[in-house]
């Protein structure tokens, strides 16, 4: 990710602080570099992060090979992309598969 990215990169080590401890809802994208659908949804998530940044943090966690296995295991992520919305430190919504911007915003609307 570039430095001007609207999304936040998280790891197993930073997940508790950056996601579970966040004062606003966090949409976490579980992705991998080799995942084609993950690459398709990435620009959509950047747009949502830029437009909804006052209401929502969009975080990305790379689950490629051995990267960050604990978080993916803890939240039973078995296919990617999987996006999980956390509110007040708890998962409240799970979205599996690449979706367009309108579909993602509809999925998130009740939480924002």
Curated annotation (Swiss-Prot):
Domain of life: Bacteria
Alphabetical list of PROSITE patterns matching this protein: THIOREDOXIN_1 (PS00194), THIOREDOXIN_2 (PS51352)
SUPFAM superfamilies on file: Thioredoxin-like
Keyword Disulfide bond carried by entry: yes
CDD domains hit by this protein: TRX_family
Domain (Thioredoxin) ranges: 2-112
Disulfide bond positions: 35-38
Family, as annotated: Belongs to the thioredoxin family.
Purpose of the protein: Participates in various redox reactions through the reversible oxidation of its active center dithiol to a disulfide and catalyzes dithiol-disulfide exchange reactions.
Name used for this protein in its record: Thioredoxin
């Amino acid at each position: 990710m570039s430095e001007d990215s609207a999304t936040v990169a998280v790891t197993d080590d930073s997940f508790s602080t950056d996601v579970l401890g966040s004062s606003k809802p966090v949409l976490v994208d579980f992705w991998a570099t080799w995942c084609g659908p993950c690459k398709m949804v990435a620009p959509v998530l950047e747009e949502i992060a830029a437009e909804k940044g006052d209401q929502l943090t969009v975080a990305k966690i790379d689950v490629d090979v051995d990267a960050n296995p604990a978080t993916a295991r803890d939240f039973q992520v078995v296919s990617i992309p999987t996006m999980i919305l956390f509110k007040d430190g708890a998962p409240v919504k799970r979205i599996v598969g690449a979706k367009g911007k309108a579909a993602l915003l509809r999925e998130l609307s009740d939480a924002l």
